[in-house]
Amino acid sequence: LKCKKLVPLFSKTCPAGKNLCYKMFMVAAPHVPVKRGCIDVCPKSSLLVKYVCCNTDRCN
């Protein structure tokens, strides 16, 4: 997950109200993203699932 300050053409901007980018992946397979997108609050990681969040709504 790369957090962006500037907006390149291929970056995604989140809708209003969900202004954090996040990526979710399994701890057992850290290089295989399970889900990514926009969220309002960064979820807590668990023993099985890890979340990586940006503090911005622009990411790729």
From Swiss-Prot:
Gene3D superfamilies: CD59
InterPro entries: Cytotoxin_Cobra, Snake_3FTx, Snake_toxin-like_sf, Snake_toxin_con_site, Toxin_cobra-type
Record carries keyword Membrane: yes
Keyword Cytoplasm in record: no
GO-annotated biological processes: killing of cells of another organism
Tissue and organ distribution: Expressed by the venom gland.
Subcellular location: Secreted; Target cell membrane
Keywords associated with the record: Cardiotoxin, Cytolysis, Disulfide bond, Membrane, Secreted, Target cell membrane, Target membrane, Toxin
Main location: secreted
Gene Ontology MF terms: toxin activity
Any single GO CC term annotated in Swiss-Prot or TrEMBL for this entry: extracellular region
Cysteines paired by S-S bonds: C3-C21, C14-C38, C42-C53, C54-C59
One Pfam family it belongs to: Toxin_cobra-type
Domain of life: Eukaryota
Assembly and binders: Monomer in solution; Homodimer and oligomer in the presence of negatively charged lipids forming a pore with a size ranging between 20 and 30 Angstroms.
Family in the record: Belongs to the three-finger toxin family. Short-chain subfamily. Type IA cytotoxin sub-subfamily.
Role this protein plays: Shows cytolytic activity on many different cells by forming pore in lipid membranes. In vivo, increases heart rate or kills the animal by cardiac arrest. In addition, it binds to heparin with high affinity, interacts with Kv channel-interacting protein 1 (KCNIP1) in a calcium-independent manner, and binds to integrin alpha-V/beta-3 (ITGAV/ITGB3) with moderate affinity.
Protein name: Cytotoxin Vc-5
Organism encoding this protein: Naja oxiana
Taxonomic lineage of the native organism: Eukaryota, Metazoa, Chordata, Craniata, Vertebrata
